[in-house]
C-alpha cells in the first residue's frame, strides 16, 4: 500500500490525479519527471475542459478545478450559485461570493486562476517582460 499526502511536481499533481494520469507505486513517480508530468497534466486539463466546457466562462472553472480538485470546485460553485440565484456559472461568481466558500478555496484558488492567466500572458509575450525567449506557442516537439 502507498500513500501520497501532498501535491508535488512541477505541474502540481496530488496523489489521486497522479494515479489517474498513470503514476503508480510500481513505477517511479512520474509527477517529478518533466515530460511525463507535462503529458499527464495536459491530459488531465483536457479531461477537465471536457467536464466544465471550453467557453470563456468555463475555462477558468477548469483551471480552478485543476488546482482545487473537481469536487472542491464543484461544491464551492454550488454554494455560490445556491446563495444567489440567477448568477452565471463562472469563476467570477465564486469570487463575488467568497464569504460563502471554504477558507482553503478562498486562500488558494482565488489566486491560482489569475496567476495561471498571468503566466500564459508572459509565456506568449516573453519579450514584453524582458525575457529572451520565444512565445510558448512556437515550441513544438
Please give the residue ranges for each predicted region.
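Outer-membrane beta-barrel proteins
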Residues: 46-50
